[in-house]
Amino acid sequence: MASPRIDVVLELFPRFQEAFPQAKIALLHGRSPAPYEYTQFVLCTTHQLLRFYHAFDVLIIDEVDSFPYAMNPELHYATKQARKLQGSTIYLTATPDGKLLQQSRQAKLATSYLTRRFHGHPLPEIKVVSGQNWMKKLRKGRLPSPLSRFIKEQIQAQRQFLIFVPKIEVLPKVLEALQQTFPTVKVLTVHAADPERVAKVQMMRKQEIDALITTTILERGVTFPGIDVAVLGADDAVFSMAALVQIAGRVGRSPQRPKGTVLFICPMLNRNIKRAQAQIKFMNRKASEC
């Protein structure tokens, strides 16, 4: 099984170890110090597929529409080379891109829908609130009112939360305003180029901190049970429809708390937000028909 992002394989590895205690599983990624040795089950980043030739009977590509896999012909070639000639490739994603959808419509790919999560509850739907001049308020060291209310609710409920922002330069502004308004909250920032990214995600997972302020790097592939999510500037162009659906998908993943809050804060609705809302509603309708 391969995924484009190291965060995903690091999260999946202990889960697979728990699910298949008798199986020896190789974990391969660019930061892994351990040399490769033959195992029946390999979990790796998609770049590691370049090391294999006709090796796998079944090759599963998780988050197939995500960066860097989606737009990288070399990684697509590596996928074909790594699978045995008579082997099977399975693509997993909650947000298939246009090319995959076209192949599905043309019956070039067999398609299966997993419309319900394992706990059987519907996907949490997106709530949009107006956030006029949110950047101007941050420059003055103040949190936008909807975000402040959201954080206050999390503190009162003693829940962890994620705040997504559109740009790296927004991270310190939100952090400073949050710490000034809610000094007791243990919060860090994280982004793709952060050298401590993996460690910070682990701190969140171990509940050593209350929140992460993040870019889209945590839009998919990470699970923090019971969290709520806010997206500041959800109408920014960086938030594609797929990214917004994936962000909403961070919520409600625990059977102990299958519901939760997905809050989008923005001056206005745009096409991507409307499409993300429609996609989640579509999946919930499809699940109710099963």
Model-derived regions, located:
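Conserved helicase/translocase motor-coupling segment
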Residues: 161, 166-223, 228-236
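Non-catalytic, charged low-complexity extensions flanking SF2 helicase motor domains
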Residues: 276-290
